[in-house]
């Protein structure tokens, strides 16, 4: 109850402040576009990437460089140790502090990333469902997706049509909530807190499928060139292979197995990571399609990308001029 009151107070304090969103699936080019927008209009950047919150997961999560983090006054990065747990509520708490600091300095914020849950938490509120049951979650994480789906169907059939059943983590959460509280996650979702920011502008960028796939493959190769294997080896030396296998960021577990067991050759390893990231990108698109506040832009060529950036800058500048003349831009 205390958390609910605090969240309500925060939402009231943050009403009518300049915040904007640029979202899209992994590898689509969000960060580069966000930097171009920020250069033109002087915005600070908040990462809404669910993996960039973890320290030491740098290359595999495509974090901005240290110089870029300083230049664009980044928030939402390196919030917790890579072995720690993190969730949307903790992210919103951190985002509150960051936004308050930037707004105090009269700077607008562009939130950029691909985590649909973080976007929803900031713009539509948080679900008040019970926290994670670690003992039950450990048990469920040992099961494959089909077994999890059968269990959810048995205990909460109404949730099956609602939950993203291609994502084991979503199935686990639905099972966990139902078995812990006796109430379906669907019912809990109806009892959300107030949104963190309102009003806001939100842009969803996408690429034609062939180009998106090429970009994703190129991105993975560049990560290996930058030292992804060496980064993973450092994590294994620090926390052991068991900790790396529990890491939720795509690629680290596969690379760890490759380094220690040589299960695949390098090409097979890159292809396995690509398949996982491609599947994640599809799930991201599915999520964003359910967000009515997003303005969708398909960037078919460099000219359309340029026009999008120009239009985005104009819309943001107009929004600030109309509502926040005391803010910098």
UniProtKB/Swiss-Prot annotation:
InterPro entries for this protein: Dimethylallyltransferase (IPR039657), IPT (IPR018022), P-loop_NTPase (IPR027417)
Binding sites annotated in the UniProt record for substrate: 26-31
Catalyses which reaction(s): adenosine(37) in tRNA + dimethylallyl diphosphate = N(6)-dimethylallyladenosine(37) in tRNA + diphosphate
GO biological process entries: tRNA modification
Residues involved in ATP binding: 24-31
Homology family: Belongs to the IPP transferase family.
GO molecular function, one term: tRNA dimethylallyltransferase activity
Function: Catalyzes the transfer of a dimethylallyl group onto the adenine at position 37 in tRNAs that read codons beginning with uridine, leading to the formation of N6-(dimethylallyl)adenosine (i(6)A).
Region (Interaction with substrate tRNA): 49-52
Keywords: ATP-binding, Magnesium, Nucleotide-binding, Transferase, tRNA processing
Protein name: tRNA dimethylallyltransferase
Assembly and oligomerization: Monomer.
Gene (name only): miaA
Cofactors demanded by this protein: Mg(2+)
PANTHER family for this protein: TRNA DIMETHYLALLYLTRANSFERASE (PTHR11088:SF60)
């Amino acid at each position: 109850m205390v958390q609910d009151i605090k969240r309500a107070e925060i939402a009231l304090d943050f009403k009518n402040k300049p915040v904007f969103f640029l979202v899209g699936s992994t590898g689509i080019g969000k960060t580069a576009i966000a930097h171009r927008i920020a250069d033109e209009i002087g915005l600070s950047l908040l990462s809404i990437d669910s993996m960039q919150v973890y320290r030491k997961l740098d290359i595999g999560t495509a974090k901005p460089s240290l110089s870029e983090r300083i230049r664009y006054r980044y928030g939402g990065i390196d919030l917790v140790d890579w072995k720690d747990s993190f969730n949307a509520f903790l992210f919103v708490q951190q985002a509150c502090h960051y936004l308050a600091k930037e707004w105090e300095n009269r700077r607008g914020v562009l939130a950029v990333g691909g985590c649909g849950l973080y976007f929803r938490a900031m713009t539509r509120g948080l679900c008040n469902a019970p926290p994670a049951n670690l003992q039950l979650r450990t048990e469920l994480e040992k099961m494959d997706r089909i077994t999890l789906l059968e269990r959810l169907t048995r205990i909460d059939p109404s949730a099956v049509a609602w939950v993203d059943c291609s994502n084991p983590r979503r199935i686990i959460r639905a099972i966990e909530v139902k078995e812990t509280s006796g109430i379906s996650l669907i019912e809990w979702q109806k009892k959300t807190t107030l949104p963190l920011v309102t009003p806001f502008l939100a842009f969803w960028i996408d690429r034609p499928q062939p180009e998106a796939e090429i970009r994703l493959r190129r991105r993975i190769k560049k990560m290996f060139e930058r030292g992804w294997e060496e980064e993973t080896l450092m994590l294994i030396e620090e926390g052991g292979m068991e900790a790396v296998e529990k890491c939720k960021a795509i690629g680290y577990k596969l690379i760890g197995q490759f380094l220690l067991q040589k299960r695949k050759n390098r090409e097979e390893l890159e292809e396995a990571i690509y398949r996982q990231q491609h599947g994640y990108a599809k799930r991201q698109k599915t999520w964003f399609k359910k967000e009515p506040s997003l303005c969708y832009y398909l960037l078919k060529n460099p000219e359309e990308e340029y026009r999008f950036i120009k239009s985005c800058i104009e819309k943001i500048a107009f929004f600030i001029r109309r509502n926040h003349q005391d803010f910098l831009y």
